């Protein structure tokens, strides 16, 4: 007779027939199958007899459950047996989750960075510090809570099994991904920080300081990147305010020393009519030219200090999660006004100079906008800023580049238009775009400018481009800056919008999931022998998993749409998200309608591995399979476009950065398929043996390829991946000594119709002697061999990592370290 049971954790308890009866009865109640008390008694007795037949005094809980399932089936209660199995699986899932939580907390609190991938899943957030460990415990616990309670069981299993990856699972039930913050709007009108109202700044220094505050406050109410899509346009008005202050100071000083009036009439009234955006020669007609010169110089110094402070703050405000600076990005380059150009020039200058210790600033990610007529060609007004950006890139990794006028970005660019009647006027003094020069232009000759050369002042310091002079009319246009594409540093972007304005400002990605494409290819390879059969099976599986990802993303959207304005006191109540302040609202109002301005994205990794598994060929080498690879992403993009029409939400296709997921997918698949006989004809090292899957559609990093070939292979994917993409190519040597080569490469990327791109390199610093260059085992200058004295800066996805506190060898997860080992072409 059985007297004891052994639970799964090894504990022993007294055997109870009543518990067997209760378990069977509970299963019956979940079905419509009829049963009697006699049926229940017979079932229980049969179970008891079966577990007692060997004479054992103690049995395991799982053995009893196995007998219950078998007995129910034998007695014909099939539905009840199925229900009992489901109940058992659910209990196992709950039990396993609780066990996982304990194991995870133990790993976080008792491991170090070198031994724990959990502590290194984000290269710019250390899990080793007290605040970091505390955050990791909360993060990992909420991941498990979401898998257990908030996510459909099917999708949770697919995530745990590695078929898909639900990104930022720790924030699944809390908030959204990223946002292009309307920094200019908040600076112009002031904002409530939560502890008090901050009025509009009156100088560039204060504006830059408040910009860091805005980005920091917003980053705490989301989980992804925070960006300003046009920092030059946003900060330019405050450069002008500083100029007027500085000019007034110089004028007063002039009057004190000279004893003569510095200007004709009332000084304060006159200052209201001028702007630093106006040509210097006009300002010199109103004020002593030395006063103007000194005011401009002082304003430039102020702007330089402001940009230094902005970069410094964004590298030191570790308030996000108590252990992380805001994942910030600044887009710039298209403002051709004097004030806007001063912002851009000093942003580049400050990045070039580095932080206080001369090291490279990891944040913010600087992104320079390339566009013909503005920045790209020698005749463009901001071409000089492009040249400076290239010099900065060669020394400091940043800026990255976004092509505003690519074939897939240009259609979104919009202009305001205005017509000025100048009939009867023979000529006008017009400002040359981006310069202080003024030229006399005859207006009685019709001319249309393909690339506008001149500007016309329509308000104090506000200049519009002259697109044409026709029949005595000036046809003016002004770029609407937030219709020009911007990107988060990692690559995420938004632009198209079926629910409102097609702009970047005030919008962002809500959530994205990534599909493990190599998993589908592994299963297709095992199921068929011919390439065509494998392709057919692969695409069938892809369609099925796309439906599941759609369902999971819609569930996530529904969950966060139930959040209220009080959940996001800064984002919603201060009007950062587009339409959030269109109408009066109560703090208990839900935010679902506002979130319809954002996007849901489906990402992918492992095109390189898929090509090998399905065709046996090498991505980026055998170009006869290019169409097949492209058709995979076309399928995902088509699906996203279809869902946009069906659900009336913004869906987009994403070339996943794959920081943590690259290694996770590969390790799961290695454990699952490494010994499969049907994969014996595959070089599994090229698939998951190397420890990671290749980012999105990129050529395998171990392939030593040319720039031309890499562009030919990867460029066509950019027009398909409207949620974000990036292209980079690795150059060797000291790039600061070969700016022409850097320009040649960036120009080639621009010409290839890419959307977002940059070059990358290795960059090391020795803290012992200050050497900057490439350090192998020892510093070539002082001979130091202490790794802790070396700062090795590397690009991990779209952003950088590397500092004395977060050396790449300490902060990168195993998958990314394996990738770094293989890198030849990025």
Where in the sequence are the language-model features?
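Charged, amphipathic alpha-helical regulatory modules used
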Residues: 1-108, 808, 816-822
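Contiguous, well-ordered alpha-helical segments that form the cores/surfaces of helical PPI scaffolds
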Residues: 600-613, 634, 795
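Long insertion/accessory domains within large nucleic-acid-processing enzymes
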Residues: 780-826
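Amphipathic, well-packed alpha-helical segments that form the structural scaffold of globular domains
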Residues: 25, 48, 550, 554, ...
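Metallocofactor- and cofactor-centric catalytic cores in central/energy metabolism, strongly enriched
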Residues: 301, 305, 613, 808, ...
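Conserved catalytic cores of very large enzyme subunits
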Residues: 90-94, 100-596, 617-618, 622-795
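Short, hydrophobic beta-strand segments
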Residues: 3, 47-53, 328-329, 609-611, ...
């Amino acid at each position: 007779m059985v007297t004891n049971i052994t639970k799964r954790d090894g504990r022993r308890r007294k055997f109870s027939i009543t518990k067997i009866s209760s378990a069977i009865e509970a299963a019956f109640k979940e079905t419509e199958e009829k049963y009697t008390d006699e049926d229940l008694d017979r079932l229980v007795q049969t179970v008891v007899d079966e577990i007692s037949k060997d004479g054992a005094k103690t049995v395991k809980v799982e053995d009893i459950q196995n007998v219950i399932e078998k007995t129910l089936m034998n007695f014909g209660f099939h539905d009840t047996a199925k229900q009992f199995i489901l109940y058992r699986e659910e209990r196992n899932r709950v039990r396993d989750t609780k066990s996982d939580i304990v194991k995870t907390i133990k790993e976080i609190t008792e491991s170090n960075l070198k031994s724990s991938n959990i502590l290194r899943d984000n290269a710019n957030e250390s899990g080793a510090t007290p605040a970091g460990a505390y955050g990791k415990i909360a993060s990992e616990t909420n991941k498990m809570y979401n898998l257990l309670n908030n996510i459909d069981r099917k999708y949770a299993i697919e995530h745990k099994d590695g078929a898909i990856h639900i990104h930022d699972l720790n924030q699944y039930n809390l908030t959204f991904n990223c946002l292009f913050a309307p920094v200019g709007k908040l600076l112009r009108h002031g904002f409530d920080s939560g502890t008090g109202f901050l009025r509009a700044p009156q100088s560039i220094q204060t504006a830059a300081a408040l910009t860091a505050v805005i980005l920091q406050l917003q980053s705490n109410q989301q989980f992804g990147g925070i960006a300003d899509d046009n920092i030059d346009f946003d900060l330019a008005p405050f450069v002008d305010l500083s100029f007027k202050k500085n000019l007034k100071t110089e004028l007063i000083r002039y009057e004190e020393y000279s004893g003569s009036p510095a200007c004709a009439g009332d000084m304060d009234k006159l200052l209201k009519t001028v702007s630093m955006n106006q040509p210097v020669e006009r300002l010199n007609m109103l004020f002593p030219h030395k006063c103007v010169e000194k005011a401009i110089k002082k304003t430039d110094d102020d702007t330089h200090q402001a940009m230094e402070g902005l970069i410094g703050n964004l590298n030191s405000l570790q308030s996000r999660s108590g252990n992380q600076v805001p994942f910030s990005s600044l887009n710039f380059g298209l403002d051709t006004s004097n004030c806007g150009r001063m912002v851009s020039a000093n942003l580049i200058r400050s990045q070039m100079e580095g932080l206080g210790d001369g090291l490279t600033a990891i944040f913010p990610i600087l992104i320079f906008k390339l566009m013909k007529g503005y920045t790209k060609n020698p005749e463009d007004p901001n071409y000089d800023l492009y040249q400076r950006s290239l010099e900065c890139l060669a020394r400091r990794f940043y800026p990255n580049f976004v092509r505003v006028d690519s074939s897939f970005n240009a259609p979104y660019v919009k202009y305001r238009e205005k017509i000025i009647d100048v009939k009867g006027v023979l000529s006008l003094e017009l400002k040359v775009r981006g310069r202080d020069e003024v030229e006399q232009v005859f207006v009685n000759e019709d001319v249309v400018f393909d690339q506008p050369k001149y500007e016309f002042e329509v308000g104090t310091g506000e200049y519009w481009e002259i697109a044409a002079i026709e029949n005595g009319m000036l046809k003016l246009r002004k770029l609407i800056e937030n219709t020009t594409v911007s990107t988060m540093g990692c690559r995420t972007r938004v632009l198209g919008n079926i629910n409102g304005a097609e702009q970047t400002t005030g919008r962002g990605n809500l959530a994205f999931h990534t599909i493990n494409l190599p998993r589908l290819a592994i299963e297709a390879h095992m199921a068929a022998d011919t390439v065509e059969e494998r392709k057919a099976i692969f695409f069938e599986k892809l369609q099925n998993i796309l439906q599941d990802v759609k369902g999971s993303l819609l569930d996530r959207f529904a969950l966060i749409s139930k959040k209220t304005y009080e959940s996001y006191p800064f984002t919603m109540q201060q009007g950062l998200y587009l339409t959030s302040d269109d109408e009066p609202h109560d703090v208990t109002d839900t935010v679902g309608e506002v979130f319809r301005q954002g996007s849901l994205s489906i990402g992918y990794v492992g095109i390189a591995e898929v090509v090998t598994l399905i065709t046996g060929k090498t991505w980026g080498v055998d170009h006869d399979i290019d169409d097949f690879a492209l058709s995979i992403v076309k399928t995902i993009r088509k699906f996203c476009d279809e869902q946009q029409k069906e659900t009336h939400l913004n869906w987009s296709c994403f070339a996943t950065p794959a920081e943590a997921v690259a290694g996770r997918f590969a390790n799961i698949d290695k454990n699952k398929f490494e010994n499969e006989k049907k994969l014996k004809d595959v070089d599994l090292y090229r698939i998951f043996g190397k420890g990671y899957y290749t980012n999105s559609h990129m050529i395998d990093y171990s392939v030593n390829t040319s720039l031309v070939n890499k562009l030919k292979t990867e460029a066509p994917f950019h027009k398909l991946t409207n949620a974000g993409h990036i292209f980079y190519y690795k150059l060797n040597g000291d790039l600061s000594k070969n700016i022409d080569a850097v320009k040649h490469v960036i120009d080639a990327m621009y010409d290839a119709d890419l959307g977002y791109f940059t070059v990358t390199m290795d960059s090391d610093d020795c803290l012992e002697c200050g050497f900057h260059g490439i350090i192998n085992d020892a510093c070539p200058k002082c001979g130091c061999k202490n790794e802790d004295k070396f700062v090795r800066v590397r690009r991990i996805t779209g952003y950088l990592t590397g500092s004395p506190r977060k050396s790449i060898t300490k902060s990168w997860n195993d998958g990314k370290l394996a990738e770094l080992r293989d890198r030849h072409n990025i």
